[in-house]
């Protein structure tokens, strides 16, 4: 009889262990955007605490250096600064575009409209080319930088969100925690970066900017920018831009989310804006 009870207990323990092993797989299947929305926990007095409790992600303070006009009808999806000009890619079906802008005035100096069936996304410069992603069409567009003439295209097998370039590659986001490394000549994928915050995937990575060995990424539906190690994919810091529009007495009712990061290497400053924002901000970071 004792042996019978013992056998039953052993079977029960084995059943519980098997159920626990199945639990992580179910969690992965259900994570999706919910995991991304919870990726930044509540802030503390020092920084943003990582999910595993191992420490705090440092928050970088900023100062506003300049405020420039920005087209309030521009649904900003990509932003690059080069040689005194801004290059901006915008989205929405029927109104997606690629533009060269005067930074000081926000005036459009050159522009090309995308086909109405394409939703424009991230933008990057490579040599004499401008590369622009599209959202769900799996199509990348290539233009001449000087004349905005379309000179080619390429395909990819995921959604297109943000795009930037380091010294060797293009780096592309797709709304998950994965960054895709593309060859800038063939546009073939040659690697990936798994972005984590406190050991957990950081989802909803959007517009990107490569700055001195790190990748700055807008987190969709937030006012935050993650600072990511190019080598490890670990989040090293965070910029919280909540309230930056209100400081300029801009109503947030008519605007969409923060999106758009461009590095001004001449001034060592960062240009940031958002979808339908009437302002573009030049900020300088300083550690807390």
Predicted regions and their residues:
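Beta-rich, blade/repeat-based domains predominating
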Residues: 72-83, 116-126, 156-173, 199-213, ...
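A short helix->beta-strand "capping" segment at the edge of beta-propeller domains
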Residues: 50-73, 103-109
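Conserved beta-strand positions in repeat-built beta-propeller and related beta-rich domains
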Residues: 87-93, 130-137, 170-176, 217-221, ...
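Beta-strand-rich domains and repeat architectures in extracellular enzymes and scaffolds
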Residues: 65-97, 111-124, 161-162, 274-279
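Hydrophobic, well-structured mid-protein blocks that either form specific transmembrane helices
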Residues: 140-198
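A short beta-strand motif characteristic of beta-propeller blades
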Residues: 63-70, 107-114, 148-154, 191-200, ...
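Short loop/turn segments that connect beta-strands within beta-propeller blades
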Residues: 101-106, 144-148, 184-187, 229-233, ...
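Blade-loop segments of beta-propeller domains
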Residues: 105-143, 148-160
């Amino acid at each position: 009889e004792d042996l019978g009870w013992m056998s039953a207990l052993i079977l029960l323990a084995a059943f519980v262990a098997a159920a626990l092993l199945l639990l992580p797989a179910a969690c992965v299947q259900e994570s999706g955007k919910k995991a991304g929305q919870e990726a930044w926990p509540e802030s503390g007095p020092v920084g943003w605490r990582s999910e595993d409790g191992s420490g705090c992600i440092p928050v970088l303070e900023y100062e506003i250096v300049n405020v420039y006009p920005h087209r309030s009808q521009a649904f900003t999806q990509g932003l690059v600064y080069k040689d005194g000009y801004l290059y901006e890619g915008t989205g929405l079906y029927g109104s997606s575009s690629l533009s060269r802008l005067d930074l000081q005035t926000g005036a459009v100096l050159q522009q090309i409209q995308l086909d109405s069936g394409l939703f424009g996304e991230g933008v990057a410069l490579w040599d004499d080319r401008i590369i622009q992603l599209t959202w769900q069409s799996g199509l990348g567009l290539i233009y001449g930088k000087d004349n905005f003439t379309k000179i080619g295209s390429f395909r990819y097998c995921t959604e297109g969100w943000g795009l930037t370039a380091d010294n060797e590659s293009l780096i592309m986001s797709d709304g998950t925690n994965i960054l895709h490394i593309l060859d800038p000549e063939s546009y073939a994928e040659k690697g990936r970066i798994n972005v984590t915050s406190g050991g957990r995937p950081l989802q909803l990575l959007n517009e990107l900017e490569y700055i001195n060995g790190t990748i700055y990424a807008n987190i969709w539906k937030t006012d935050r920018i993650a600072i990511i190690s190019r080598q490890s994919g670990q989040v090293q810091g965070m910029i919280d831009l909540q309230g930056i529009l209100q400081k300029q007495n801009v109503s947030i009712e008519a605007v969409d989310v923060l999106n758009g990061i461009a590095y001004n290497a001449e001034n060592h400053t960062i240009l940031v804006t958002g979808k339908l924002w009437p302002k573009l901000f030049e900020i300088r970071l300083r550690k807390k």
